[in-house]
A protein has these predicted regions:
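STAS-like cytosolic regulatory interaction modules
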Residues: 1-110
Length: 110
């Protein structure tokens, strides 16, 4: 897995290439935590991510760490398996996994 970070004003986009699992979660989380303080929007581009396990849920729905400002998190380019996982999580526990605030380009009905 590798990730490319693009900064555009107050938005950071992480383009992830490869799976998101417990092996790849720590470096992704560290990269997000290291973003400059002026970044208020964090977008995960998952066009090249075919598989995501529960670690992806931890990455996308983690609470804001103490001492960090709130960042709006969105995801784009969801492939079928990660989208299926997110939908299942939202169906099981919509209060914990509010899918509507995360998705920015999925046109299929939720």
């Amino acid at each position: 897995m590798n990730a490319i970070t693009t900064l555009n004003g107050t938005t950071a986009t992480f383009t992830v290439r490869g799976d998101i699992d417990f092996d790849t979660l720590p470096p992704l989380r560290a990269a997000a935590d290291a973003l400059p303080a002026h970044v208020t929007d964090l977008r995960w581009d998952l066009n090249h991510t075919c598989f995501m396990d529960i670690a992806g849920l931890h990455l996308l729905f983690a609470p804001t760490p103490p001492g960090h400002a709130y960042r709006r998190i969105t995801v784009t380019g969801l492939r079928p398996q990660p989208l299926r996982l997110l939908r299942l999580a939202a169906e099981t526990n919509p209060a914990t996994f509010p899918l509507d605030r995360l998705l920015c380009d999925v046109r299929a009905p939720l």
